[in-house]
Amino acid sequence: MPCWFLLLLCAGLASAAPGAPALKIYGMDSKPVSYADAGQPAGLAVELAHRIQDKLGRHDAIDIVPWARAQSLAEAGPNVLLLTVVRTPERERQMQFVGPIFTSRVVAYAIKGRLAELRRHDPGLYKLHAGARRGSIFANTARGLGFNLTDETNTSEIAAKMLMSRRFDLWFDGEELMPGAMERAGHRPDEVEVALRLGTAEVYFAFSSGTSKELVKAWAGALRELKHDGSLQKIQRKWLAFLPEH
């Protein structure tokens, strides 16, 4: 048997060895990035995580949970992976990052047909009541830029419902997340319009503090391979093809 085959076999067995700590993987309910489809995890980040696990010979389960719960689980101990986190200086002190895996577009939405009226009363839109998902980069960006963020919700779906019921006037979220949130809220995506574009944010896999650096490096290496052979780009196109080009 060739030596190279034995080396590969040993590496695969080591990565899947019973003594290797299980990785608890959590995705947030944010279609099309990660979400539950008929009880099974799906989405861009989920598919990418499965591809990386295939390369590493691992089969750790992926659970879809609310962002607040995922964050608290990651803070509780090692061997936790959050599938989609924006890298910030504060989070760098708490987590280890692999990526980026895609770029999020930070957008403010208004009910379609209301924007002209809103601008007449407040040209800069800074005084309007606004909402965003709690703890998200969208909420942090809006607040940091001086917008009047009066409501933070547990999910993008709840934020969409509140916007459409006029509980607030502006909804800050990711352009890639808006269609799924609107549909789950019982509305069509074309019932809202873009009020402001606030830039982009790179999204990463985030491992909790204390997770083995060797495991994090293995994920980073597998992601580099998927990027090099074009697989990452194919997965991105599959799940984000609906986004308009700017």
Model segments located where?
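Ligand-binding clefts/hinges and TM-proximal coupling segments of bilobed small-molecule sensing domains
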Residues: 59, 137-150, 190, 223-246
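N-terminal signal peptide c-region/cleavage motif recognized by signal peptidases
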Residues: 11-17
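A ligand-binding cleft/hinge motif common to bilobed small-molecule-binding domains
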Residues: 71-72, 85-93, 169-190, 195-199
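Flexible hinge/capping segments at coil-to-helix
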Residues: 110-129
